Design a protein with these regions (language model features):
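A generic structural signal for short hydrophobic patches within well-formed alpha-helices
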Residues: 48, 123-124
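Short secondary-structure boundary/capping segments
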Residues: 8, 16-17, 32-33, 83-84, ...
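Acidic, metal-coordinating catalytic segment for phosphate/diphosphate chemistry
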Residues: 1-15
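Short connector loops at helix/strand junctions that flank enzyme active sites
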Residues: 11, 19, 38-43, 87-91
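Active-site-adjacent beta-strand/loop module that shapes the phosphate/pyrophosphate-binding cleft
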Residues: 20-22, 79-104, 116, 120-122, ...
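A short coil-to-beta-strand element that immediately follows conserved catalytic motifs
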Residues: 69-79
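Short, charged, solvent-exposed linker or helix-capping segments at domain edges/interfaces
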Residues: 103-109, 126-130
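Conserved Nudix-box catalytic region and its N-terminal flanking loop in Nudix hydrolases
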Residues: 23-64
């Protein structure tokens, strides 16, 4: 795991590609006109609270959205990118491997309409997916 995931620095939040074998867990955003990318497929994660480290932010967001306790050992890749909402700041993107059993244990929270598994290659090419997240997953696939 990259050391910066346990350090405090200025970042806006964390998004996570949660892989279950060759598929990625996706969430359909709420269809509300007052949020960015309404009714669009995205990945778990969100904004930093207080002085969280990237790992703390990731673990809190995944717990809130999916009811999963994400162990740091599940992180297989990470990279810092420009924030999707503020290009002058940084955001963290991580790729994690979770088991079928963990996937079955998901308790979907109150953010988003639904979740499902999508083949990674389909996610990269699909319409209706946040483009920056497609690029980040593509980076992982090309560099692994």
């Amino acid at each position: 795991m990259d050391a910066y995931l346990k350090k405090q620095f200025d970042f806006t939040g964390v998004k996570a590609a949660l892989l279950v074998e060759q598929s990625i867990l996706v969430i359909l955003r709420d269809n509300k006109p007052d949020i960015p990318w309404p009714n669009t497929w995205e990945l778990p994660g969100g904004g930093r609270e207080g002085q969280e480290t990237p790992l703390e932010c990731l673990q809190r967001e995944v717990w809130e959205e999916l009811g999963l306790t994400l162990k740091e050992e599940s992180i297989i890749w990470s990279k810092i990118y420009p924030s999707m909402l503020d290009k002058d700041r940084s955001a963290v993107f991580v790729v994690c491997q979770i088991s079928q059993e963990q996937y079955r244990e998901i308790r979907f929270g109150d953010e988003g309409q639904e979740f499902k598994l999508m083949p990674v290659e389909d996610f990269i090419k699909a319409e209706g997916v946040i483009p920056q997240l497609q690029e980040r997953v593509r980076d992982y696939v090309e560099k692994k």
